[in-house]
Amino acid sequence: MPSRTSFDPGTGPCIISIAALFTRSHPYIYMASHAHRIEVHYSCDPRLQMRTERFRSLGIPLRELHLVDIYTIATSKRDFSPEELSQIGAQLSNPVVQRYSVDRPTEADFDHAIEVGFLPGVTDNVGATARQTIEDYFGFQFGEGEAVFSSQLYLAAGDLTPESLEKLAGALANPLINRIHIKSREEYGKKGMDAVTPFVHLDDPQAAGAVGLDLSDADLARIGKEGILDPRTGERRGPLALDLAQLHAIRDYFRGLGRMPTDVEIESLAQTWSEHCKHTIFASAMDDDVPRGLYKTCIQAATNAIRKKRGDADICVSVFTDNSGAIIFDDEHLVTCKVETHNSPSALDPFGGALTGIVGVNRDTIGFGLGAKPCINIYGYCTGDPDTEPALFRGKNRENPILSPRRIFEGVISGVGIGGNCSGIPTPQGWCYFHDRYVGKPLVFAGTVGVMPRAHNGRLLHEKQALPGDLIVMVGGRVGKDGIHGATFSSEALDPASPVTAVQIGDPITQKKFSDVIVREARDLDLYRSITDNGAGGLSCSVAEMAKESGGCHVLLDRVPLKYPGMAPWEIWISESQERMTLAVPEEKIEAFMDLMKRRDVEATVIGTFTDTGRCVVEYDGTTVMDIDLDFLHDGLPEKHLRTLPVETAYPEPDFPCPDRLDDLLLAMLARKNICSKEFISTRYDHTVQGGHVFGPVQGSGRVQTAATLTKVVPGSMKGVGLSQGIFPTYSEIDPYRMAIAAIDLAIRGLIAIGIPLDAVALLDNFCWCSSDEPERLWQLKRAAFGCRDGAVAFGTPYISGKDSMYNDFSGFDADSRPVKVSVPPTLLITSIGIHPDVTTAVSMDAKFEGDLAYVVGETGEELGGSEYLAHIGIEGGVVPPLDIEAAKMRYEKMTGAIAKGLIASAFPVAHGGLLIALAKVAIAGKIGMDLAMPGGMRPDRYLFSESPGRFVVTVAPSDREAFEMTFGDGAHLLGRVGGATFRISAGKTLIEQPIRAMETAYKAPFGGY
């Protein structure tokens, strides 16, 4: 079948084989013995309106668009009869709203047909589900070389030039994962599109080989950057992210053994020692005042100090030692939490990267202790403005353009949504942040909360221990080339050499099956002793990490089930193919375990044994391909001593005029993308599944994005899990220390506002830094880490988990082929989790009753540094607002006490955009006006737009005024009353007078068409 990257619609059918855009070889597409196409289309397709409008917005002259779902059934051992194919079509369609055809093209009015499918080896979840549907219906199993492939056919009508066709194809497909087949109407004719079956076909696998390291430093550095030279292809295999000191350590170790390392051993060490896995920057000594590294000095030390001070009141159960952190929920249950990042893969394939991120952190929950049940998902996206189209390219001469911010934004939203919705996990909590420095590499945060009993059958379920003699069992999906070098890839900046194989697509259906059987059955039957997920580094990391529990491992790599034949041993060992867990199963229980997995349709394979030899030994087809001391594997990487260089941060508070009226400014600020409604995300994410919904992502009749959500996770219990977060990237360049304090404070305040006590709150930290090899960036990192330490200790809120991603940079070219580097702003996400003692007393954000009193609780300063207001008027700099934490703590204790007593009708933390935006959101949420007067002594715009931390907007019933004001004293400031349909603020004269409806329109307009 022809393959080319340009096309002329008038000269014949064309496949845009995206694989041809890259120098690395890809498996090829070939025809099966029997191939049949089933085409399914809606009578009225609900997907088309939004897609058509989106394509037209790109300047594509579409008159009409039709969408057809394609299922290509490929078999070799048997063929299906026409009657059977018709039965399959009926199973794959809904007769009420859909029609299907078998081996007959769909008829419609169109000018060009564009079919988009997956490249060989890319996970095809829809195809896999269709295959299983057919197997269940007919009661037989597809064999090797047989499959069902899904694709989508777009029938486009309009005056489409080759340029507009190319633009449409680019909007429909991602060249890293998709193939495109285009035909004109004449070529489509009566036969339609071709039945393409993208099986993977690889050459015979190459045996593990020795790699000589007695090379010059220049040649060693090339191995570290580009990978091992493949003797068969003459190409480098992909980044190892090993520096010279690490390569010297590896060379010296194997010199001591009297042999050269194998490629399996070098690849394994690269995964284990990667920044992604070892967090070397946080672990390394820094300057003279941080000899133990930032992690031990700031994050771990803060948590240890807090836990020691709390004594018997400590809420922590497991911190920093397992896949997630855990706190006490009640006397019988624990809740776990972990937030991961999946930035580099999401830059290449936003949908697959985000989907893999969310199902991966789900596995961190399943892999905590002996298995927690995922009960809440969390998301966060930092991208460029979706309305911009930056001209950035990975190659010169405008080759290999980066994906647009909108493409990334829409892709990551879909990925996390599919992951949660298909897994039956609610996704109530999340946020978005936009900045032009995220155009080169987005930040994609994915988190999961889990719940589990504290003990079962006399065992503490948060404890696990693989023992010598236990069998190593892999469950879930099979291993393929997807995800190879994922850990090392994410340990570097994105550049033109970033590997295609690092892209993965998760399979939530497969994961849901083994998740349920592990958490609901195998765990409580005591069928295994330890469990962890196959994430970064694949088997090389999961097995080797568990081997520390027993003291060694012996792996038979040729037993690992593969997606297709032909993979080399090193590829099998480090592949990050998704939906896999590794378990330690006692030999006497293996029969019961395997029988249970079979009955639940979960593939499970014994791939070796845990030992106490102190070594990680891996065999392939009877040959030892890896034999390394565990001590060297895990702790042999050389220590670093990092140096920082202080950054000048003296930014004066800017001087600029204040408008006489602030009406237009209010509406414009409400429409800023970091402030406005993102309800379209919340409506796509199921946040009520599992039945624990208390406070969801939007609140009030006006449906405003909330700062915190609340979910019941144990049936029958009135306790709930609250989630919130804090993030201030624009503060980082000005004052990273205060930035960290502000993020911690906002994360805590979100929970305080719904009634969760401060002593029931724990934190998670996610550092996403840039250019971490630059001393100036390390100084900012150091200041932020010390802010994390001081803020957590002062508030008494321990860290239970965290993650750092240190190279969030893009290196490429602009439209004129000039080298360009785009680095994200130093970004710290603080996530908060807290236990609400009684969800029936929780308070929502929306103003509720005519005549209620509106207050601001806390003190307002004049600082505007890094604020949304200054960003809106185009001014950088200023002073980041400080926080008196001791005063804030006292205020927060009063807040939760007042909420518990029913003195507060609504509460909302002041955050991005300042007091005015918080007041406006509370009013919009309640669809009720306010008549407010601001105090004198401060310029109106500074008072209303300052983002001073530690504050809340609250409404109080007049009957509770006396008790409320006695509780807070001079810490609460009466602003006015709730009522009417107009939002009015005065300061001796009218500053703002706007209908609530106009404010709601402005707030919801930016993403109204999504």
Please state what every model-predicted region is.
Residues 7, 22, 28-30:
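Aromatic (phenylalanine/tyrosine) cluster motif
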Residues 32-43, 67-72, 110-120, 151-154, ...:
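Short glycine-/aliphatic-rich beta-strand segments at the starts of folded cytosolic domains
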Residues 39-47, 78, 116-126, 159-160, ...:
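Short, surface-exposed ligand-recognition loops at beta-strand->loop->(often short) alpha-helix junctions
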Residues 51-55, 83-93, 129-133, 164-173, ...:
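Short amphipathic alpha-helices in soluble, non-transmembrane regions
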Residues 62, 121-123, 143-145, 151, ...:
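Glycine/proline-enriched, intrinsically flexible loops and inter-domain linkers
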Residues 62-67, 115, 131, 136-157, ...:
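Interaction-mediating elements
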Residues 95-148:
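Short, solvent-exposed interaction modules
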